[in-house]
Amino acid sequence: MKRRTTVALSILVLLVSSATSLAADAADIEFKRTRLDDKFRSEGVAVGDFNSDGRMDVGAGSVYYAAPDWKMMSVLEQPKEFDPHAYSDSFCNFADDVNGDGRTDLIVVGFPGKETLWFEQPASPDGAWKRHVGTPITNNESPSFLDVDGDGRRDLLLGYDPGKHIGFARVGGATPWKLVPVSAENAPGTDRFSHGIGAGDVNGDGRTDVLVTAGWWEAPDSPSKTPWVFHAVNFGEPCAQMYVYDFDGDGDNDVASTSAHMIGIWWHEQTPDGWKTHTIFKDISQTHSLNLVDINGDDLPDLVTGKRYWAHGPTGDVNPDHPAVVYWFELQREGGKPRWIPHRIDDDSGVGTQFEVADVNGDGLLDVVTANKKGAHYFEQVRK
């Protein structure tokens, strides 16, 4: 059976493919940096129209930055600001019309083990945003927003309690959202500070499977048949978002991951005899978030990641004060083998625990947006 390649973990991966139709040589690609904020407000960001004016804005926890001049607007009564020596209460942000009223709302995954909230966009820009609880407990540090069950709506992929399940929350409708278990109780990857979770078609049957560093759950013919069958695999060290794609072009899907608090960017090759881990890059520490997107429009998805600056403060982890870089790694194939060419985007910003790659300004090119302890930044892709 011919294997089907699936790029998963963010709906943006599916939506932005049309935005990268203009192929370009990497030497002709640059990124123009705009600092949206110099305060630490969030380690996640969302791209969406948060004031219904037709432009893409940037959400970051308690605020959003309104395009085109990026004026900061508060979602709460007062915007939050955090000490860079500590942590925020905003680890992942996603944009979605949660209640189906035609307006884009802001989903904020809080500190690990705490609530996921969603803030309802008001009918008028000067109205008050309403706060709702989506999930009372959200475990694992890299929850993701994608369609797990194939119903056309994005779900929140997460670990949750009680029971320590890997599963997904059906976003929308009544709150808290309905939780659907993928795993049995006490599954790996379900502690509040667990690292590494993702989704994609691991076995090539056309269905979206779920994976953590300890293995993957095989999607049944109906997602309601729980628990899913678990396959134990060593997908390496504690990581962040995990992606599934046929990187070497041999017909079966592989996995990409990045080190959350140590050093390493890897691809895990699926072979007839099992899985083999390869190092892509080892010059960046704390690559605590990852995106898989086609930056240069050559129909091969590239990796985008960077350093989570001061992930555990100024003395924690490895090389906490090294430059806060952002990179994209260009996927190329030679003789049936993949290789990744590193291209630096910036060296004084970094990433958080989640970031977005999207066509922010509508020019057909993919841009990068981040938020972390160095503030919030928008990197506009420009072509020479």
Please annotate each region the language model reported.
Residues 1-4:
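Positively charged n-region of N-terminal signal peptides that target proteins for export
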Residues 22-384:
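Beta-propeller-forming repeat regions
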Residues 8-19:
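Bacterial N-terminal signal peptides
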